[in-house]
């Protein structure tokens, strides 16, 4: 499923993949803005977080959208205290189909992309 994430994310205008981990961002006002990244799971207390390739963190527009997703299906979407107050949800990749994944990644990109890029992209659809 990570190959699907990569294919979808990199098909979006201006999207790039981080060199050091599985994460995608878009340049906005001179800074890379992340829209999808591998979940860094806290497996053991007092130890560094480790990548969990089965879970993707996805940026959402706001807390309301986050709550809607979290309440929609807890088999697919969840959160953890690290993400409290931050507009992102955690997605179990095995629980969603490619169509849902494409919608989630595209919406996440729309949250972070500069307005001109969003308008061009939406105008072409």
Segments predicted by a language model, with ranges:
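Charge-dense, helix-prone N-terminal extensions
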Residues: 1-125
């Amino acid at each position: 499923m990570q190959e699907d994430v990569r294919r979808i994310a990199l098909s979006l205008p201006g999207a790039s993949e981080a060199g050091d981990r599985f994460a995608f961002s878009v340049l906005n006002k001179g800074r890379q803005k992340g829209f999808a990244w591998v979940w860094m799971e806290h497996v053991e207390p007092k130890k560094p977080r480790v990548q969990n390739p089965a879970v993707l963190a996805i940026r959402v527009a706001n807390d309301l959208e986050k709550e809607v997703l979290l309440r929609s299906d807890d088999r697919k979407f969840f959160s953890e205290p690290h993400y409290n107050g931050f507009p992102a949800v955690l997605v179990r990749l095995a629980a969603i189909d490619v169509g849902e994944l494409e919608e989630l990644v595209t919406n996440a990109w729309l949250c972070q992309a500069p307005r001109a890029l969003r308008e061009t992209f939406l105008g072409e659809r």
